[in-house]
Amino acid sequence: MHHINWATKLLAAAAWFATAVTSPLQAQTTNLTIMVFQGMQNLPLLAAQSQGFFAKRGLKVDVRIAPDSDELREGLAHGRYQIVHAGVDNAVAMAEVAKIDIAIVMGGDNGFNRLIVQPEIKTYADLRGKTVIVDAPDTAFAFLMYEMLRKNGLNKSDYEVRPVGASFRRLDAMLKDKSAAAAMLNMPFTLRAAAEGLGDLGSAVEALGPYQGTGAFVLRQWAAGNSDVLVRYMQAYIEGLRWGVDPKNRADATKLYIDALKLNEAMATRTLAIASHPTDGLTRDARLDPDGFKNVLGLRANVMKQWAGSAPAPAKYLDGSYYTKALAGL
């Protein structure tokens, strides 16, 4: 009986210790609602969710897919989403047009944008008098299209612009409506477009130079009050990115793309190969590309004539302090 009593007390003590150790973590579990555009760039999020990188840092992350950039920007401004990942020109638009105090805190990729066209469009000149479709007419990837068209002899007055929303909506519009002559699309929608017989007038980065596509941005006030949460989120994101592009995880990462993007295995394999390319894929550790961001500002200055055509210094839109802390803690 003495031994049973001792063993019972030991088990009780062990149970109490386990509770004492785990309770603080459980009590600190933080719910986040974020918004992203559907696409290849979400590999870090898919990995962080499936591998428990968020959970082990006390985070429960609800990932919402953006129907368009208007909802993403407005949702961030009104607190529906705490963190968003999108073309960083959206953050600049929030700061300059809506006068919202934002900070870009992390990079992601160059956008992987290509100018996709209907099969009968063989040259830029063939787009004269046609309708091009965009997410929103005055932000981000639309500027890439306008500039590619301008460099090839087409001014804004030479074509119509129709906003339809995110990449999946633009591809759908082009497949259902032949009058939707062209759109900027990114991965894996460019692969789907090719499989459906649509044409391709080339890569935006090859035509226009370095470009900061996807990045993470937040309200500065929220970040200041939730710095630890933001750092933990970024650590999980970076860990997810590292896991996703690691060759030893290729089969599992491919499955994530198959499930999340409804791709067949061949297309998912191709998508992962592009995402994990050491120089042309998702940016290592989601670093921001300074030259790419300068070009984002330059495009807004040139296309929208913002800032009287002279882009400001990038620093006013950036806060790298959270990223530095996140990386240091990995």
Give the ranges of each region predicted by the language model.
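N-terminal secretory signal peptides that target proteins for export/translocation
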Residues: 1-6
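Extracytoplasmic/secreted envelope proteins and their assembly/folding machinery
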Residues: 42, 46, 73, 88-91, ...
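Secondary-structure end/capping motifs
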Residues: 224-308
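Conserved C-terminal helix/tail region of periplasmic/extracytoplasmic solute-binding proteins
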Residues: 297-330
